């Protein structure tokens, strides 16, 4: 290890060296609280600038070719860029419909290409902050899932993208045919599909080969492709792009997109998900890393792993847990595993009245729940939350209540939920129905909010 660069971020989502190698950009933040862009001086091992942005972690740092700008994606569905000199925001593009996961500058530094969970790759002009176009097709089903990674071609105005569908694809930045509804004319090539979700992609320095990494069910995959292809569009293909293709023409397009690209090596990584990769400057070695913290160096010509290095060496076999056997575990504030109470206990003698909110609780489905809040009005005039201190009881066993005041249905009926401290008591009406009804989940209402593309 050469150095440890310690900033404010609890989570690091991306790192990128500047083109001249003098600086390191880092995006991450405090999940659910703050996003942060860090810029480090590599030689001095010192922080040049820290820029807080949005209220969640940031993704996909990328440098402009002249080392002056850094672009990145945000979970508020925006693409942004800042000036390295003073941290000033110079680009804000809000055209995405979901988290923006990666970005890359064009070769001239005048545009930024961004990808995200909304299944699109978008092309944005830096100076005007204007969304130029979607590179990916807007046809339903053209892409089957979000896009997690994008990389620029070293010699062409093209980008390589990869995501949930497991198929790396190359798109051109400049449209060469008139737009037609349903076309996918910016697509240059489709590489053979790989298992699982793609997490990172890259061209080698010459652009003659490409690589992608993915994971599925706890296993990783590294695939190296030949990418020495002609980007020109033949006249017969242009004619198809200029109209709505029939079945035979669609097959012809698929053949064109698969032309001159092939899989060279497919390297399985059993038991370890692989998330990132990088080519060496001479293109002979591909470094990949994943969930086990080990960097593996693969010889591109043979596809063999030639060396492994542990990113952080752990001395001894001490588990990161200072709680001895039999000792009560502390509250894990990151995961909320336990509800241990450390607040001051309110005496009944201090309370003039209790207030329970809501005054009426109605649970109409087996998976419904309600959160109650019990507030103590103090004789001194103040108010205190005593939800975690009250003794609760429900008539007829209609519902269960957790220590934090979450009410879950157990059986149908009507009754009363009571909360008390000492002799001071407050009640709320409770009605529970349809506890034993079959639950029919709705995709939009119940499933979509908790899954990721």
Predicted regions located by residue number:
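WD40-repeat beta-propeller superdomains and closely related acidic/aromatic-rich repeat-like regions
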Residues: 1-334
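Extracytoplasmic soluble-region selector
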Residues: 331-452
